[in-house]
Amino acid sequence: RAVRARATMSRTIWNVLNPNATAGGALTFASSLADANFVIGATGGDWQFQLKFSSGSMSCNMCWNVNERKENQIDLSLVTVDASNDINGIAMNDPVSGVADLALIKRLNQWKGGNYLTSGNQYPPLVISSERLMRLIVAEDALANGNVAAFEAQIDAIRALDGEVEFNSGGAVSDTAMLMHTRRMNLVLMGLRLGDMYRWGITDPMWHSASDAILTPGHMLPITIVEIRANCNLNGQGCAG
């Protein structure tokens, strides 16, 4: 049910992005709520549904590309790196406490095998769904329906998992800004960021001005030109013969 809640949430976001992505605030997730609430009630303890890897089974190609080959990197708005592109600090602060975000640190520690300052390997778990995601679904739906108290309660339940100070609605950080930040920090490396960027009108300074991401926001197949040219389903030449 946790995976289904993620899938129906993603479908709701997809429907907002297509045919044209428009910036907005919180969304209602009516098709996801029952599953999300069930998982929250049935789990706890910062539960995650993971794909696990090991030297005795199989490796994670994405993990290898980030941790070892470094073909892909953690965004530099989140971390700082040294001359070898190894993480040497946290760039993203929590908007309430003003110090390095604890949810981000916890996820990066997991990703690097215990300590985000180490190089890591090709075997960290991939998080497919989690208690945090379920609470984010419930929180956003509550905010979209004007139930600020329920939104705040879910956000603070997530923050409590890391020992963060409580968020108080109506303060210096707006509810929407808190939602956006909490999703970003708690869904790192889950493949959900691009949809959030599109629906909230966020762009990356690395995106080329003539890219599909800029010209036609909503594109969800961000692969390299080499891969496009090699794929007969994408290169415009067809697959016949």
Where are the regions a protein language model picked out?
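Active/binding-pocket-proximal capping segment
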Residues: 150-161
